[in-house]
């Protein structure tokens, strides 16, 4: 009986741990992509399952994530992540803003500064592309 009770408690604790630690940190987005480290050192992207978005459980080494979200929702995300602007750059039809959040563990060095959150404005339909640590590929 003690073994069964112990196993039940262990399963419950594991489930609670997954629920509180996992999922995406980019809440409120759509069209998610997850970046994983490939065997050769490059990056592989995958569309996450709904279970991943809820719990975040994976056996792969996650290197980052991205999604699209309404530009009007970005401020709420930045506030929730306690992100501070590091620098920004603009072009003819885009604005890139780079942030650092103490709540995101991984970061990259850009222009000698730590960056772990990248917001690219300029998409159609009032959408922004948000990524950790930066947007990979084209936008």
Predicted regions, residues:
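Positively charged n-region of N-terminal signal peptides that target proteins for export
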Residues: 1-4
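Short, surface-exposed beta-strand/loop "edge" segments at domain boundaries and coil↔beta transitions
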Residues: 40-45, 76, 105-109, 136-139
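Hydrophobic h-region of N-terminal signal peptides that target proteins for export
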Residues: 9-17
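Mature extracytoplasmic domains of secretory-pathway proteins
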Residues: 52-110
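N-terminal export/targeting and maturation segments
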Residues: 16-66
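Generic recognition of long tandem-repeat/solenoid scaffolds
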Residues: 44-45, 96-100, 130
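A cross-kingdom marker for long, charged
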Residues: 110-139
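A structural detector for beta-sheet-dominated domains
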Residues: 27, 35-37, 100, 122, ...
């Amino acid at each position: 009986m003690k073994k069964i009770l112990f196993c039940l408690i262990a399963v419950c604790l594991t489930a609670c741990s997954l629920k509180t630690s996992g999922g995406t940190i980019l809440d409120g987005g759509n069209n998610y992509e997850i970046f994983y480290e490939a065997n050769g050192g490059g990056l592989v992207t995958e569309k996450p399952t709904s279970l991943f978005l809820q719990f975040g459980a994976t056996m792969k080494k996650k290197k980052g994530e991205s999604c699209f979200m309404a530009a009007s929702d970005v401020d709420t995300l930045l506030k929730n992540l306690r992100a501070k602007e590091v620098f920004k750059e603009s072009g003819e039809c885009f604005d890139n803003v780079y942030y650092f959040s103490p709540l995101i563990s991984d970061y990259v060095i850009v222009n000698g500064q730590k960056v772990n959150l990248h917001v690219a404005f300029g998409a159609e339909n009032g959408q922004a592309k948000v990524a950790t640590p930066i947007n990979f590929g084209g936008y």
